[in-house]
Amino acid sequence: MNKNDYTIRLETPADYRSVETLARESFWNVYRPGCLEHYVLHCLRSDPDFVPQLSFVMEKDGEIIGQNVFVRAHITADDGREIPIMTMGPICIAPQWKRQGYGKALLDYSLEKAAAFGAGALCFEGNIDFYGKSGFGFASDFGIRYHGLPEGEDASFFLCRELIPGYLNGITGEYATPQSYFVDESEAEAFDRQFPPKEKLRLPGQIF
């Protein structure tokens, strides 16, 4: 990857279908047969907690090859406070450009812009092997629990990063993925019919 061979900019309405197609191609048959992420993106844009000022696309040679979005969320602290944070994603890179540094470049740019926007911290689900390289740690190390996960269960997927140093100092509590990320699968199926047909496959490693 050459840092001069791509640009990152804000998404515009003219990009919506290209971005949804990108997400569909990137996530298809990865976590489940087919995917929901393109419909999640479609729905998030009309949610009041969606942050359009932090909805990014990465372009290379005039083609959108990556995207990332941010959504307002909160931690329910054990003392009863609601601590405003953000969550992130879907984030993806076109399959043919994965593992070449573009994903980390997009992620690091996005995090820098989210910090400048005033986000204090970020919680979301991801792989520490990738996101740890951009400053994420296990949320449990911050005293943050994942809603609905029984004590003692593996929470290594649940990650956190402070964007304002010390933002979570003295806070323990629970995080729940915003409801806007949960979509009706029959509605997602209907939405998917707007795209060219793709075969859904049950593959090893899928989690749904």
Which role fits each region the language model picked out?
Residues 60-62, 96, 162-167:
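Short loop segments at secondary-structure junctions
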Residues 165-208:
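Acidic/histidine-enriched, glycine/proline-rich intrinsically disordered or flexible terminal extensions
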Residues 80-95:
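Conserved acetyl-CoA binding element of GNAT-fold acetyltransferases
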Residues 116-120, 126-153:
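Conserved active-site alpha-helix within GNAT-family acetyltransferase domains
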Residues 54, 58, 89-92, 119, ...:
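Internal, conserved structured core segments that host functional sites
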Residues 20, 27-69, 74-75:
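Active-site rim helix/loop that mediates acceptor-substrate recognition in acyltransferases
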Residues 88, 96-97, 101-109, 119:
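Conserved acetyl-CoA pyrophosphate-binding loop and the N-cap/start of the following alpha-helix
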Residues 1-14, 21:
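Conserved N-terminal entry element of GNAT/NAT acetyltransferase domains
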